[in-house]
Amino acid sequence: MQFSKSNKLANVCYDIRGPVLKHAKRLEEEGHRILKLNIGNPAPFGFEAPDEILQDVIRNLPTAQGYSDSKGLFSARKAVMQYCQQKEIEGVTIEDIYLGNGVSELIVMSMQALLNNGDEVLIPAPDYPLWTAAVSLAGGKPVHYLCDEQADWFPDLDDIKAKITPNTKALVIINPNNPTGAVYSKELLLGMLELARQHNLVVFSDEIYDKILYDEAVHISTASLAPDLLCLTFNGLSKSYRVAGFRSGWLIISGPKHHAQSYIEGIDMLANMRLCANVPAQHAIQTALGGYQSINDLVLPPGRLLEQRNRTYELLNEIPGVSCVKPMGALYAFPRIDPKVCPILNDEKFALDLLLSEKLLIVQGTAFNWPWPDHFRVVTLPRVDDLEAAIGRIGNFLRTYSQ
């Protein structure tokens, strides 16, 4: 008897860790050294967590052996509540905050609690693909609105408006954006929120990169601009505090919660079912948010992340036929390959061919639900020497590549 995967997974996809990565693992098993530009995982690139965070987690391990409240430790949630005040998000109490095993778990929970079969959710293209996967897994229909590369990758408000239907339940905003690195202006956010207001949409705001900003870019929390809208804000420690392996994130519910009691009860139920988030990592939150913000040393001159972002941008734009909008935040670049110079029909095949030829791992643009096979994503985490070697390999490969 054959056992097949559930039909619920028919439209679920997460190609950041997809078939190309499987080939990379096989090559590593054969003894090849793979230069990895595929995942925003700071620690393997030498970005260590602040010592005080690690020390506090170690110090609290003896008291972290049991379950916590399903929403999380009071002290950690209070620290998040105080962070809401810094970000000017109004009306948030301790009970409006949920701690999770990373933002990923909370995204899936929030979609499972909200969506019925056929409900539509507006998601940016390109996006962080977990958003699309979570909507599909919950029985919803992801509808992708275009971000405009010619306008610094800002979302196209007209495209969002055109894609709203009677079935649309929610609008997803990823700011700073993964994979493009765009940081949205106040005017843009207000325009997006006005569409949500007109059509009574729930707003999901992914703000995991809110402290990773370059060139004096300013992050504005979506919920701070819309106290009248139900807004779910997602953030965590993985990127800004370099502890992705801790799986420590949070969800903040703001706005008219009295209109969403049934939905919130659904989130509560799912939070209870998974018992609680990883308790040792919850002890990192108060120290991280209340301590010295060492991320600023990395993103302000002469910080390492800033230097690597700059070099990545310069090197990509030096490759004939490749152009890249300068990322203003996050840990990625999302360059375009001019189809007139190097026509690519299948960008997953391009990523695999690059891996096999150059032992270099990137992620194809369609993995981020970009509709055309003309982009790819690289992380800006490697040291400058490795970035120069990697992007040099991409340039050499494209010189002779054809499909």
Question: Locations of the language-model features?
Answer:
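A short helix-loop-beta submotif of the ANL/AMP-binding
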Residues: 137-143
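Conserved core segment of the aminotransferase class I/II
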Residues: 227-303, 313-314, 398
